[in-house]
Design a protein with these regions (language model features):
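Basic nucleic-acid-binding interfaces
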Residues: 2-39, 48-91
Length: 91
């Protein structure tokens, strides 16, 4: 859980958008309650109550910086940061 909180803090600070690991971003979004659908290299995340659909693609094991910014804006606009502290109930 500490690793997820560290990644969330890093994303919210916005200082290193080019250095966010893709696998960590996927885990964080699932922890926030997003559902994932995969089509090829596109990982599509959606959540009830959130109008935006997040479409992420890995690039050399990292997230693309503009996609990290999109995720940050969704987390801030919908106040999802507190949900990352909740225990993960999905396996």
């Amino acid at each position: 859980m500490a690793r997820a909180n560290k990644l969330l803090d890093q994303i919210l600070r916005g200082g290193a958008d080019a250095n966010i690991p893709f696998s960590g971003m996927v885990q964080l979004l699932k922890r926030l309650g997003f559902q994932e659908r995969v089509k090829g290299s596109h990982h599509i995340f959606f959540l009830d109550g959130v109008a935006e659909i997040l479409n992420l693609q890995p690039q050399s094991g990292k997230c693309k910086p503009y996609q990290v910014k999109q995720v940050r804006n969704v987390i801030i606009n919908y106040r999802l940061a507190g949900k990352a502290d909740a225990p993960d109930t999905k396996s």
